[in-house]
């Protein structure tokens, strides 16, 4: 039975289902710790299930009955769900849409810095404490509600030491950014790598990603990325290791 988390036992079920899961073992417990009280209708648990329905895409760790899951996700208005096919069968009637690959770097390991345009790289200043608002503006210029949510969540996490953002800047303008948006349970979930369109393809984004991953791994974190099929070659080229897969299913 999928139920809203209201008791210590239900909370423990949620955390147990997340434990040891790549990416989700960091993102879901951290989201619950920060927003479980203010967004009680977002987090649900079953005997072996953790479920976050905070947006149009649900995130699932563990296992659920396929028919019950399909009905529950439809009731919540979810358009998609991301799950581990090796552990959880898809919701009944839902269609396989996309495979997401997990790439990562073992704690303590270091990658060589990839090539980048030397003159461009030298012209940029690295900022390890950029303004959250400026990063949000770069990432979501045409989605004001998403930008505001991102800004609020980043501020909440960063003030607690649970997220980091790095940027490359020129004259105060962000040229490139990447962040670790969930530092929890030994994992550093990295995401939102973005370079301004005019300067893409020059290697600065990849080098910034590797620099941050190396720094986190040196501290004992395991940097992890969840990427779409079109980004697999990029992360492979950087030297990151493919560690697993999740699958996105779309509602009928």
Regions found by a protein language model. Give the residues of each.
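Short amphipathic alpha-helix that is part of the acyltransferase structural core
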Residues: 1-27, 99-103, 107-149
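A conserved beta-turn-beta hairpin within the catalytic core of GNAT-like acetyltransferases
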Residues: 54-59, 182-190, 200
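Conserved GNAT acetyl-CoA-binding A-motif
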Residues: 76-86, 216-228
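Conserved active-site alpha-helix within GNAT-family acetyltransferase domains
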Residues: 87-97, 206, 229-246
């Amino acid at each position: 039975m999928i139920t809203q988390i209201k008791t210590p036992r239900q909370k423990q079920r949620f955390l147990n289902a997340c434990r040891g899961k790549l990416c989700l073992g960091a993102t879901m417990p951290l989201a619950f710790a920060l927003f479980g009280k203010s967004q009680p209708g977002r987090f649900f648990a079953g005997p072996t299930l953790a479920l976050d329905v905070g947006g149009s895409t649900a995130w699932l760790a563990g296992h659920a009955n396929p028919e019950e899951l399909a009905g529950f996700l439809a009731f919540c208005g979810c358009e998609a769900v991301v799950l581990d096919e090796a552990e959880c069968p898809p919701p009944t009637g839902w269609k396989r849409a996309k495979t997401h690959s997990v790439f990562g770097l073992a704690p303590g390991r270091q990658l060589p810095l990839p090539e980048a345009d030397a003159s461009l790289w030298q012209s940029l200043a690295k900022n390890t404490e950029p303004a959250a608002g400026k990063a949000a503006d770069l990432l979501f210029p045409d989605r004001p509600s998403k930008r505001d949510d991102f800004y609020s969540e980043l501020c909440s996490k960063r003030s607690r030491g649970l997220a980091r953002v790095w940027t490359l800047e020129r004259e105060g303008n962000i040229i490139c950014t990447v962040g670790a948006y969930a530092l929890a349970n030994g994992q550093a979930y990295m995401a939102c790598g973005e370079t301004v369109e005019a300067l893409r393809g020059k290697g600065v984004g990849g080098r910034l990603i590797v620099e941050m991953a190396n720094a986190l791994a040196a501290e004992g974190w395991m940097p992890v990325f969840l990427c779409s099929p079109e980004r697999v070659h990029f992360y492979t080229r950087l030297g990151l290791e493919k560690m697993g897969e999740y699958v996105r299913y779309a509602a009928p």
